[in-house]
């Protein structure tokens, strides 16, 4: 993944909210001035082992790059939260091509 090139002004970053920061919410925050949006905290273990969970979040991220959303859907940073560094890396690899950055929280 290439380094993220951010706008000079990051005064309005849409912080993540659990179960709220999906594509429609991120689009609204971008429409109202946010220069960067985050996904909600995603479980890397569920991305790796739960096909339905993975497909839902892949569709959400693919929507960020679609023709209808490309000007508002990006940049987007995916957040991963887990307690197994190997699982965090596996989860990151599943989404890395659909986002502009990945943040992780090791708990």
Task: Give the predicted meaning of each segment.
Residues 2-8, 17-98:
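Glycine-rich, positively charged N-terminal anion/phosphate-binding segment
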Residues 39, 103-107:
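Non-cysteine beta-strand/loop elements that form the S-adenosyl-L-methionine
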């Amino acid at each position: 993944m290439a380094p993220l090139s951010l706008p000079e002004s990051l005064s309005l970053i849409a912080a993540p909210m659990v179960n709220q920061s999906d594509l429609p919410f991120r689009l609204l925050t971008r429409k109202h001035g946010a220069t960067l949006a985050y996904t909600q905290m995603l479980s890397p273990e569920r991305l790796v082992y739960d096909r339905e969970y993975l497909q839902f979040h892949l569709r959400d991220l693919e929507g960020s790059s679609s023709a209808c959303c490309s000007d508002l859907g990006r940049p987007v940073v995916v957040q991963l939260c887990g307690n197994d560094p190997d699982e965090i890396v596996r989860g990151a690899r599943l989404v890395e091509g659909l986002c502009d950055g990945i943040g992780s929280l090791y708990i």
